């Protein structure tokens, strides 16, 4: 039995009002992701996949190599944090997805990114 890597994913999002143009249906959000490796071996992030859903239910898929131009190696008990952004046409929406990673033995695996909200502050209850 393979010792499955233990990776914790935490995401925080914030509305970037200064970059948004609500009158043109352009709502910009920044999100910060923290990946923590609670396992005993190094893991490396290879690819990302995002499903972005706006407030009208319109979905956009985004995928590619690494994150912010990197394929970070995360050591045991280490973490990697990055900030990126998303633009949607409505004042609220959601994001979710997964990372494809590789362990120290070359086995690839996926880590889920739990759904999180994108919302302008006046809509958050």
UniProtKB/Swiss-Prot annotation:
UniProt domain ApaG: residue ranges: 1-125
InterPro entries given in the database record: ApaG_domain, ApaG_sf, Uncharacterised_ApaG
SUPFAM superfamilies xref list: ApaG-like
A UniProt-annotated Pfam family: DUF525
GO biological process, one term: error-free translesion synthesis
Protein name: Protein ApaG
Lineage, top ranks: Bacteria, Pseudomonadati, Pseudomonadota, Gammaproteobacteria, Enterobacterales
Gene (UniProt): apaG
């Amino acid at each position: 039995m393979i010792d499955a890597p233990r990776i914790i994913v935490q995401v925080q999002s914030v509305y970037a009002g200064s970059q948004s143009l609500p009158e043109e249906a352009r709502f910009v959000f920044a999100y910060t992701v923290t990946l923590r490796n609670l396992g005993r071996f190094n893991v490396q992030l290879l690819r990302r996949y995002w499903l972005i859903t706006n407030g009208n239910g319109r979905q956009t898929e985004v995928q590619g190599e690494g994150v912010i131009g990197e394929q970070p190696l995360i050591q045991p008990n280490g973490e990697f944090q990055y900030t990126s952004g998303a633009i949607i046409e409505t004042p609220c929406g959601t994001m979710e997805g997964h990372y494809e990673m590789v362990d120290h033995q070359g086995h690839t695996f996926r880590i889920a990114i739990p759904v999180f909200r994108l919302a302008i502050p006046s809509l958050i209850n």
